[in-house]
Amino acid sequence: MNRKESKSMKTNLLYIFADQWRYQALGVTGQDQVITPAMDSFAGEGQVFTNAYSTFPLCTPHRGCLMTGKYPLSIGLWTNCKTGLEEKIMLKPQETCIGNVLKDNGYRTAYIGKWHLDAPEQNFQEDPLSGARDWDAYTPPGERRQGFDYWLSYGACDNHLDPHYWMDGPEQIRPGRWSPEFETDKAIEYMETHGGGEDPFALFLSYNPPHLPYELVPDRYYD
């Protein structure tokens, strides 16, 4: 099999995950106070895993496990990337992640949304050029992006109605929109742009909601 034939057998990959979304936050699982019609419909068309568990249901450790396939404690991610610790918690650049593997196998790689695997910039400087505050961080192009080429992301910030992002420079992008809607539109734009190329794409779409504060949703969802 030559390289061209091998490429033609690879499908595009879209991996969507949301922060803190668990069994109790889905209407399809019979939770009376939860209304998730889109997810319920999606579940009806796909496969629902009712016995799947995170090895470490905390933001940074879980994400590190997802990216590397390793237990979080084995890669030093015993808590979140945050300020106020003597140890600088972050996913080490030398770890081989799924983005690296996919890129090495001919995929165009993309990451959109919350990252929370890089050490907060205020651990190193009080007033970083990127404007990152508290647990947040701008991850510049290079090895700390773990194999992802297209990048529209941030470290950790929970203002869902007024999110910000970074791409390939320290200037913040502030769309003034609810983060899941903006990120979904950018993901669709990416897939429409790259879906017809010779090389397949692998896109990771990481929503922050339903991470608290829970009330930060557009008013129409209260109707």
Give, region by region, the residue ranges found by the protein language model:
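Formylglycine-dependent sulfatase
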Residues: M1-D223
